[in-house]
Amino acid sequence: AAHAGADAILLIAAILDGPRLNDLLKVAYSVGLDALVEVHDRGDVEKALCYDVRMLGVNNRNLRTLETTLQTSFNLASELPKEITLVSESGIQTREDIERLRAAGFHAVLIGEELMKAEDEGKALKALLA
C-alpha cells in the first residue's frame, strides 16, 4: 500500500485474529502508514485495544444484515479511548448526525453512501459541513 502511494490502510478487527492485527499494525507503522482499525461491536473493541491502535473506526453497518444505525457508535462511544482518533463510519446523513457524533467523542466521520446517492455530491457535502 505504501509503495502505491497510500497514506493509510484499513484493518477490520472482525476478520483478523489478535496476533495478525498486531503484526499488520506494526508493519503499517514501520513503513509510515496510518492504520484505521475498524470495529463493529464490543468484542472487536476489546481485541483492538490490546494493541497500538492510533485510529479506531466504528462501522455503523451490520455486515451480516447490511442495516445501518448510528446507535452502534453511540453504544460503543463510552468504551473508546479519547486519546486516539475516533471515526464513525457509515449511516451519517445530516449535519445533526455529525454534531451528535462529535458530542459523543468522535473526531471524524466516514461518509460514502449519502454522498454517492446525491444528485450533486458537492452540494450534499457542503450541506453536511455547513
Question: What residue spans do the PLM features occupy?
Answer:
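Catalytic cores of alpha/beta
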Residues: 2-4, 40-52, 88, 92-111, ...
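Short loop-to-alpha-helix "cap/lid" segments that border enzyme active sites
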Residues: 16-26, 40-53, 63-84, 92-95
